[in-house]
Amino acid sequence: MDKYELVKDIGAGNFGVARLMKVKNSKELVAMKYIERGPKIDENVAREIINHRSLRHPNIIRFKEVVLTPTHLAIAMEYAAGGELFERICSAGRFSEDEARYFFQQLISGVSYCHAMQICHRDLKLENTLLDGSPAPRLKICDFGYSKSSLLHSRPKSTVGTPAYIAPEVLSRREYDGKMADVWSCGVTLYVMLVGAYPFEDQEDPKNFRKTIQKIMAVQYKIPDYVHISQDCKNLLSRIFVANSLKRITIAEIKKHSWFLKNLPRELTETAQAAYFKKENPTFSLQTVEEIMKIVADAKTPPPVSRSIGGFGWGGNGDADGKEEDAEDVEEEEEEVEEEEDDEDEYDKTVKEVHASGEVRIS
């Protein structure tokens, strides 16, 4: 692990904490996602890594490698210096139609590529879309922890995803087409960019998941009067927000929609995108699937110490006091992660209650 040096912490997610690291030789910056060794290393983690490794597209965060430390499994990936698209909307309030289209075109291009590779994301949301640091930012899809490859795994059945973005069919306990659920989530992302609010959340009571679920099932949304968007854009949203996934617009159809095609950058045209779909398109990873699976299997063994140690088990990060502070920071971040997981559990509980009550009906 002498290859990397720490630059700074960059936050926490569903499975662990993340740090910005620098490759000592090349000075290249990478984002390093840390997942504590032991029971947290499950099939979702393995799936995320294998799925991510297979993807090579400019609108998808590049996977680099996995590394085992004494306490954590570390996943190295491309660093997106522009941060989350979510943060950009929070500071802007909402986007103009042209700006929303600019990012939506990139999102659809990335999702289209994932689907062609037989991978559906299942947790598309603004927080999982990052931006690079260029003046005209390039959108990057990240976080494949909930993705499901139809080549390697069974059809999606579990209820995952973020309440505000979740498609009606995901709330039913029947099997669903993960690709069509991704289309719905892309529609929610577009709506949020245009309006600055979630389409199916009650603004007065956003934590009321039951109300959100009911509005999703009834496809109850509206464009506020103060938001002026074209009829073309309204038409696209109305074709995405369709409860019956068989009648919903597909990714291929979105790519032919007049609103999508307006001002489409040359690099996003079908001709330019064709290069990424070639079988010989190599992976960015230097590790084979077998090497990765062995490292992930080894990571299932819990760390020898009960508490996290400084540097995530890499050592060499300053004096002993520094290490203790580092460990406390890590523990605080992991506590935050656990709190987020509790929120997920609360959501799952609500979904189960709705299932049990028989309120969910898919036409």
UniProtKB/Swiss-Prot annotation:
Family, similarity comment: Belongs to the protein kinase superfamily. Ser/Thr protein kinase family.
Gene: SRK2A
SUPFAM superfamilies: Protein kinase-like (PK-like)
Quaternary context: Interacts with TOPP1.
UniProt-listed Enzyme Commission number(s): 2.7.11.1
Domain of life: Eukaryota
Reactions catalysed, as given in the entry: L-seryl-[protein] + ATP = O-phospho-L-seryl-[protein] + ADP + H(+); L-threonyl-[protein] + ATP = O-phospho-L-threonyl-[protein] + ADP + H(+)
Region (Disordered): 306-363
Protein name: Serine/threonine-protein kinase SRK2A
Recorded GO MF terms: ATP binding; protein serine kinase activity; protein serine/threonine kinase activity
Tissue/organ expression: Expressed in seedlings.
UniProt keyword terms in alphabetical order: ATP-binding, Kinase, Nucleotide-binding, Serine/threonine-protein kinase, Transferase
Sequence ranges of Acidic residues compositional bias: 322-347
Active site: 123
Chain residues that bind ATP: 10-18, 33
CDD domains hit by this protein: STKc_SnRK2
Segments of skewed composition (Gly residues): 310-319
InterPro entries: Kinase-like_dom_sf, Prot_kinase_dom, Protein_kinase_ATP_BS, Ser/Thr_kinase_AS
Induction pattern: By abscisic acid (ABA), salt, and osmotic stress (at protein level).
UniProt domain Protein kinase: residue ranges: 4-260
SMART domains, per database record: S_TKc
Enzyme type, top EC level: transferase
Start-end of Basic and acidic residues biased regions: 348-363
GO biological process: response to osmotic stress
